[in-house]
């Protein structure tokens, strides 16, 4: 077994899932040509193209809303929010739309997405870059 850093393992997992299922796509700020803030998506834009590795504007609620719509439409999006501290603007959509879609529609719709968000940061940055409020999310899913 190869020794991989966490970022290398994430990159490899994304490649494997994208090769296995053409419904899987990535979206987030700077994840395309730049390879993401931690370089977890490095090389994926070149490998899978702009339709499956989508650079978005800096708009977390837009990233989440788009991912939810894609998921409900049959795709398997993997949205990335650069830092957990920036997830606040998307919190309503994540908890009130995605998490409750199956119950709200009596099983007619689901929201199969994987949200990627670095937590804790590890970079000792100021506000919004080193938050670790995971407990908020573990207590909001329905």
Regions found by a protein language model. Give the residues of each.
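Thiamine diphosphate
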Residues: 1-142
């Amino acid at each position: 077994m190869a020794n991989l850093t966490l970022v290398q393992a994430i990159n490899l997992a994304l490649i494997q899932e994208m090769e296995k299922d053409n419904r899987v796509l990535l979206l987030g700020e700077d994840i395309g040509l730049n390879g993401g803030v931690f370089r977890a998506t490095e090389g994926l834009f070149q490998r899978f193209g702009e339709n499956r590795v989508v650079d978005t504007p800096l708009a977390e609620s837009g990233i989440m809303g788009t991912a939810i719509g894609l998921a409900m439409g049959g795709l398997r999006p993997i949205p990335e929010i650069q830092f957990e501290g920036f997830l606040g603007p998307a919190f309503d959509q994540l908890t009130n739309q995605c998490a409750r879609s199956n119950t709200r529609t009596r099983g007619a719709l689901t929201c199969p997405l994987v949200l990627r968000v670095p937590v804790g940061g590890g970079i000792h940055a100021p506000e919004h870059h080193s938050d670790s409020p995971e407990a908020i999310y573990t207590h909001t899913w329905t």
